[in-house]
Regions:
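Active-site Asp-x-Gly
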Residues: 201-252
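A conserved long alpha-helix in the C-terminal portion of kinase-like catalytic domains
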Residues: 230-291
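An alpha-helical support segment within catalytic cores of ATP-dependent transferases
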Residues: 4-19, 132-191
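Active-site acidic catalytic loop and adjacent metal/ATP-binding pocket
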Residues: 33-41, 175-221
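A glycine-centered beta->alpha junction motif in the catalytic cores
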Residues: 90, 96-110, 129-133, 153-161, ...
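ATP-binding pocket architecture of kinase catalytic cores
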Residues: 27-139
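Regulatory N- and C-terminal appendages and interdomain linkers associated
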Residues: 1-16, 294-317
Length: 317
């Protein structure tokens, strides 16, 4: 049973001694696996309390705290990331953490104003430039291209088992996974779950949260959300912004498109699992539309531009 906002406020007060919280509201919709609330203090600052509800959320919270240690030096006038305020345990030995919380506005993909996603691209470039060695020391998960490819093959098989994913899409994705050249990239530190729940804007600043999915993996994973909802021109502008800060292999955008398509099937599978028929129907319709475009050869190619990625070419030269 989910904890009430009063219990969460009491736990927050214990974790963040010295803070005087004056109001509390539940925030469980955007924090699956956690009991969560947003609190406001007598100094008008906002905070988020997170309480784990099982082994999976315990592991995710551990990653979140380690990730924040890694990413906090990047906080600046253009990037807001949560600050760890305090920690404790509740009577069930569940972890309780209080983080700073900045309210933000949603980033509208496809909007004429591309500045927010350009800002996101720039900050992703900085996150992707973080030290992999430091991430390893913090025990953040590390996936090689081979590991990730195997995981994706297994996931596509499970999505196929739902019987809801059109065959033309499964064939498209399986062909992409078999294209060795497409998966030539340098594993980097990534956020791991960029979407409307984890990024937003506050004035000229990007607000980023949800670092519990951070890992060392494919940088293209962080561009799946952008690739799935932006115009081609906006995507190219974002990629250009990214390349001003760090290098990328020439197939990053193709893999981002791959991830954006697979994410629809993931969402469909999740909706079926939780019994949300309406959301599942909508996701199924999106997949059918995607399948129609695939049959008409109207989807971007997922075929690798070359066998050897940009970074590997430069490493070997």
């Amino acid at each position: 049973m989910a904890k009430s906002h009063l219990i969460l406020a009491a736990l927050a007060a214990e974790a963040a001694r010295g803070k005087n919280f004056t109001s509390t509201r539940l925030n469980t919709e955007k924090t699956p696996g956690f009991d969560s609330a947003i609190l406001e203090s007598d100094t008008d600052r906002k905070y988020q309390v997170l309480v784990t509800t099982g082994k999976q959320s315990e592991a995710e919270l551990k990653t979140e705290l380690n990730a924040l240690k890694l990413v906090s030096p990047l906080a600046s006038s253009t990037l807001s990331v949560p600050e760890i305020i305090g920690e404790t345990k509740d009577s069930d030995d569940s972890s309780v953490v209080v983080l700073s919380f900045d309210e933000s506005k949603d980033i509208r993909l496809g909007a004429k104003n591309s500045e927010p996603i350009q800002l996101l691209s720039a900050e992703l470039a900085r996150i992707h430039s973080l030290s992999v060695a430091d991430a390893n020391e913090l025990e953040i998960q590390n996936f090689s291209p081979t590991d990730l490819n195997a995981e994706l093959v297994s996931e596509i098989d499970k999505l196929a088992d739902t019987g809801k994913v059109p065959g033309v899409l499964l064939s498209r994705w399986e062909k992409a996974l078999e294209d060795i050249g497409l998966w030539r990239y340098r594993p980097t530190v990534i956020h791991g779950s960029i979407n409307s729940d984890t990024v937003g804007t506050a004035g000229d600043k990007l607000v980023m949260r949800g670092f519990g999915t951070m890992r060392v993996s494919d940088p293209a994973e962080d561009f799946g959300w952008i690739a799935g909802g932006s115009t081609e021109q906006a995507i190219n502008t974002c990629l250009a912004q990214y390349l001003e800060i760090r290098e990328a292999d020439e197939n990053l955008l193709k893999r981002a498109i791959f991830y954006s398509e697979v994410e629809i099937a993931r969402w469909l599978s999740y909706c079926i699992e939780i019994g949300d028929d309406r959301a599942a129907e909508a996701a199924g319709a999106d997949l059918e539309n995607l399948a129609e475009d695939a049959q008409k050869s109207e989807l971007p190619s997922l075929e690798a531009t070359s066998f050897i990625g940009l970074n590997q070419q430069r490493d070997e030269s």
